[in-house]
Amino acid sequence: LEFAKRKWSVAIAEINDERAKETAEMVKKEGGKAITIHCDVTKPEDLENVLKKVVKEWKGVDILINNAGVAAAGWFEKIPLEKWDWIISLNTKSIIHGCRTFIKYFKESNSGGYIVNVASNAGIASLPEMVSYNATKAATISISETLKIELAKINVGVSVVCPTFFKTNLMDQFTSPDQRQVDLANTFFGNAKTTSEKVACHTIRSIEKNRFYVITQKDGRNMWRMKRWSPELYFKVMSAFYKTGFYDKHLVKLLKVMNLIG
């Protein structure tokens, strides 16, 4: 919607046609143009179809935003292999399919462009009991870092967005073998003060400045700094918190404190 406020044309590629239609109507109300395209991001041919339809409709593409994804939790040894396949397909392979498709277009058109990959602070912080989600988001960050360098010579910018908890529909498909982990996730998202609109505004400002890491909240930035500056201390602190049961009792409070720092 932030793009719509700037009078951009927005293509909504979504597997849920009804949700795509609702989003398109909101885009139009904000002053932008919108089309909807049915898309399963796990299928490369669907991404090819999205590109063809957008180019046909608007004669080109300026920005690709890879925003599809799901969340999951679980102890490493208890996550079924099929759940690994599921989350990798949606969170990692979708990024690969989207980038492969649109990078080819950006190179052939020689028009420049921009790619925004939505990861998560989970890919940086590696909090416990979230290993499959952490791994896919770390992969998104690594892919983005590589593309930032590779695509510079063809004038294609890259940003990777790494929010912490914010108000989103991510819990709709959340999966875990343990109800306690589902309850914890609901608590974290339920206590989130940041809205999706704030994340979007922060992202657009970062695109305008060609900023690579888009860490949208203070708690995420503080965890990122701590891990970069003193990784051994970071893991000692996090391990101690986990051993003592701190996460279950006080993680929400910790995130609030970290939002006050920096």
Which positions does each model-derived feature cover?
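SDR active-site lid
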Residues: 153-220
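Substrate-binding pocket helix/loop in short-chain dehydrogenase/reductase
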Residues: 75-76, 80-85
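Active-site helix of classical SDR
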Residues: 99, 136
